[in-house]
From Swiss-Prot:
Membrane topology recorded in Swiss-Prot or TrEMBL: Lipid-anchor
Record-linked Pfam families: EFR3_ARM
Assembly description: Component of a phosphatidylinositol 4-kinase (PI4K) complex.
Protein name in UniProt: Protein EFR3 homolog A
Stored SUPFAM superfamilies: ARM repeat
Entry keyword Lipoprotein: yes
A single GO cellular-component term on record: plasma membrane
Region ranges (Disordered): 210-230
Assigned protein family: Belongs to the EFR3 family.
Gene Ontology BP annotations: protein localization to plasma membrane
The UniProt record lists the keyword Magnesium: no
Amino acid sequence: MPAGICGCCGALRPRYKRLVDNIFPEDPRDGLVKADMEKLTFYAVSAPEKLDRIGAYLAERLSRDVMRHRYGNVFIAMEALDQLLMACHSQSIKPFVESFLHMVAKLLESGEPKLQIYGTNSFVKFANIEEDTPSYHRRYDFFVSRFSAMCHSCHDDPEVRKEIRIAGIRGIQGVVRKTVNDELRATIWEPQHMDKIVPSLLFNMQKIEDTDSRTGPPASPTTGDKEENPGILAENCFRELLGRATYGNMNNAVKPVFAHLDHHKLWESNEFAVSCFKIIMYSIQAQYSHHVIQQILVHLDLHKKDSPRIRAGIVQVLLEAVAIAAKGSIGPTVLEVFNTLLKHLTLSVDFELGDRRSSAGSAVFSSSSTRESDERIVQNAIIQTIGFFGSNLPDYQRSEIMMFIMGKVPVFGSSPHMLDTSQLGDMGTKRIQIMLLRSLLMVTSGYKAKTIAAALPPAFLDPLLSPSLMEDCELRQLVLEILHNLIDRHDNRAKLRGIRIIPDVADLKIKREKISKQDVNFMKKHGQQLYRHIYLGCKEDDNVHKNYELLYTTLALVTIELANEEVVIDLIRVAIALQDIAITNEDNLQMFNRCGIMGMVAAYLNFLSQMIAVPAFCQHVSKVIETRNMDATYFLPEVIFRDKCSLPKSLDKHEKNQIFLTNKIAESLGGSGYNVEKLSMPYVPQVTDEDRLSRRKSIVDTISIQVDILSGSNTEDKVNTEEITFESLKKAIDNTGMEEQEKEKRRLVIEKFQKAPFEEIAAQCESKANLLHDKLAQILELTIRPPPSPSGTLTMTAGHAQYQSVPVYEMKFPDLCVY
C-alpha cells in the first residue's frame, strides 16, 4: 500500500507514529499528555527495536515545529525525548541517541535564546546518563563549538546574556563529563577542542577577578552561586577539566591558557594570571606539577625579549607555581628551573646596562630610567622565585642548589659552569654577583646542617670567600650574611643583633653545644680562611656600620658554634691584629674606619671574655672599656656608630691603658690552662694565587710587609732603635760578633718553627716565595729583550715600536774602551 494513503488514514499509520502524535495536545499550552506519554514509554521499553524510528519521527516533527516557530510543541517533543532517554537502557538506544543529538543541535542552531537554553539542558541530562557500552564513533565537535560560542554571548539584554553564558558553560561541562571518563575516547583533548573550551572558561572566569580574587585550594561555593554566577561555574568546570587530565593531555590543556593571557595582555597586571595558575596547580594531580612548571619556563624563554613587565609577570606566576609544587613532587626540573632563571637574570642585567649605556649618549632619560626600574622588578622577581623555591626544598636538594648557584657566581678560578659575564663588563659582573648572592642568601635561610663541613664544603667555601667578592661593600655584606645562615645552627643571630658592649652575656641565653670532632677538623682545615676573610674585610675603606656589625656577628657565631681552646686563641690573635691595623694605620684608613675597628674589637673581646668565663681576662677587658668610657668614647661601638659622632683628629696620643694588651691577655689565659704560646706570634693572613692576580689594591703588598717585619714585638712593646757609633761598627765587622748573630738567628728560626702553627709558617714561606718569583719574572723579562740600538732609533712594525739589534762589529765604542 502506498505511503501516501497510510498518511491520510490514521488507522493505517504505524503504531509508534500514532503514539507519538497522541502526546501532543491540541493546545501546546496544556503541556505533554502524560497518559499517552506513559503508553509511548511502555511501547518503547517493550519494543526497543522501534526506538530509532520513534526518535527519527520525533526529530522530524521537532524540525518542522522549529521552522514554523511552534515553540510549545518543540518543548513537548524535547520533554518526551528526555523521558525516553531516562527510561530506556538497551543496545538499541544508540540510534535513538543520534536522533536526540540531532534535535539538540537544531535547538542550539536557532537564534532563540530559550531554545538554546532548553537544548543545553537536555544535553546536560543526556551527559549525566551512564551508557553501558560507549559509542566510539560519536563525536561532539559541533557541541564544543556551539557551547563555546554561547560562553561568549553578547546579547543586548544582560539577564539573557548571563543565562546563555551559563548554558554554554554547563554544556561544556556536560561534554567534558561525557567524554573524559572514557580513556579510549580522547578526542576532547585534541588541540582544536581545547583551544575553544579553555579560552571560553577563562573568558567567564576573568569577569569575576576584579571583584573576587580567589587563591589557594579549590573553593566550595554554594549551589546557588554555581547556578547564578558564570564565573564561579566556569572556574569549577575548569577545575574539573584539569582534574581529569592525564600526563599526555596536560600540554593541550595548559597551552591555551598561555595563548589567552598573551592575546588579552594579562601578564603585566598579572592578578588573573596568578589566579589561573594557582587553580591549575591545585587542580592537577601532584605528580604532574613539574610539567606545568616546564611549560611556564618554556613560555618565559619565548618572551625573553619582551618588555620587562611581561617577563616579571611570567616570573611571578612561576613563583606562585613553584611555591605549590615545592610542597609535593617537583620531578627532575629542579636544576632546570634554577638554570633558566639564572639565564634570564643575566639577560635582565644585560638589558639594564644596555639601556644605561644608550641613555648616557642621549639627552632623554625618562624612558630609559623607567625601563631600568622595570628590569629591577624582573630581577627581584627572579631572586624571590629562586629563594622561595630553594628554601622549600628538602635539605639534600637544597645543598645541591647552593652548590649550583655558587658555581654560577663569576669569581677567580671558579668552575666552568659559572655565568659568562665577559660581555657585561665590570659593572655587569658586579650586578650578577650581587643578584646571585642575594638568591643564595634566600636559599640558605633556615638551612640547618648537622656538621659545618656539610654546610660549607671546600667547593662552596672557596669561591664564597674569594677576594673577587670583596671588591664592594654590598658584596661583603651578602657573603657574611650567607655565612651567618650556615654557621648559626642554634638561632643565636637575633640575640647578637646590634654591635654593642653587652653587660652580661648570660642574659642573652645563648644556645650552645659542645663542639663536635667534625667541626674541630673543619676549623683545622679551613679556620685560616675564615680568619683571613674577617681580617681583610675589616681593612676595606668603604666599610659602613652594617659591615662592622656583620663582622662582629661572624666572630661571635664562630665563637659559639666552632670554638675550642685553640680556636679561641686564634680569634684573640685576629682581634689584636685588627687593633694593630687601626693603631698603626698602614693602610691609610679614614678615621671612622679606624675607630670602627677599635669599637668592633672591644665589643667582640667583651663577648668572648664572658663566653669563656676567665675572670682575669674579663677584668682586663672591663678595665680597658671603663678607661675608654672616661677618655676615648670614640673607641666604643655605641658611640662611634651613632649618628653625628665626633671623631678625633689623630690616634697618635692614645694611652696604653686604652688598648687591649697581648701580654695581659696571655697572663690571664695562661693561668687558666690555655696554651698561650701562639699569642706571641702576630697573626698573618695567608696569601692566595687570586691575591697575586687580583686587580684590587695591594692585598699582597700589605700582607708581604707584615711578613717581612715579623717580630716578637706587639703594640705595647716598643723596640728602641740602636744608636750607631764607631764601636758598634767595629763589632759588626768583627767575625766573632757575626758568628754570635748567626747563632741567635738560627735559634730564633728554630724556636719559630717549633712554636708557630703550620698555617702561619706556610703563609710566610708562600708570600716570600711569591715575591721571589715576581722578582725573577721581572729580571727575566728584562734579559730577554733585544739590546737597544746605539743611535736610539726605533722602527715601527705592524703599529708597534721595536728596537733593532746592531751587530757588535758595527758598534762604535769610545776610544778609551778600545784596546
